[in-house]
Amino acid sequence: MSYNKLVEIIEIPDMPITMSDGCRLSARVWMPVDAESAPVPAVLEFLPYRKRDGTTARDCLTHPYFAKRGYACIRVDMRGNGDSEGIMLDEYSKQELDDAEFTVNWLAAQTWCSGAVGMMGISWGGFNSLQVAERAPEH
């Protein structure tokens, strides 16, 4: 796939991701329309700011940009935030990083994902991206 060629994309406003303890996180996903038949790499952004309203304007510029270039882009509301269940206990907690690592592995296992998963972000999302990378998840 040429990453310079723009492709048609779909947006899924609320994709549930169920953590190992049963807590459901909510994700908004943008991906090429043919990702099911031609799996693509995934880019995860894992934030405490509500995807429904808090970061919508920015998300709707950033994530479709990458999706149109052949990536699945996933914007997750962290545990206890936005449309996700649970309680957020602290910044950069073990629970937050466990959830992010679980999400990386969950994404890699989806039929529309090639198995390659990266994270991105600025500020909070940049910090937790580095912290998850330090854990060296499989994908």
Predicted feature locations:
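Generic beta-strand/beta-sheet core signal
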Residues: 27-30, 45-46, 76, 120-122
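N-terminal cap/lid segment of alpha/beta-hydrolase-fold proteins
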Residues: 1-38
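Primarily recognizes the serine-hydrolase "nucleophile elbow" in alpha/beta-hydrolase
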Residues: 105-139
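Cap/lid segment of the alpha/beta-hydrolase catalytic domain
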Residues: 34-108
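Hydrophobic alpha-helical segments that mediate membrane insertion or helix-helix packing
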Residues: 22, 100, 132-133
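Beta-sheet entry/capping signal
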Residues: 26, 42-43, 72-73, 115-118, ...
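Conserved G/P- and acidic residue-centered "switch" motifs that form tight phosphate/ATP-binding loops
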Residues: 22, 80, 121, 125
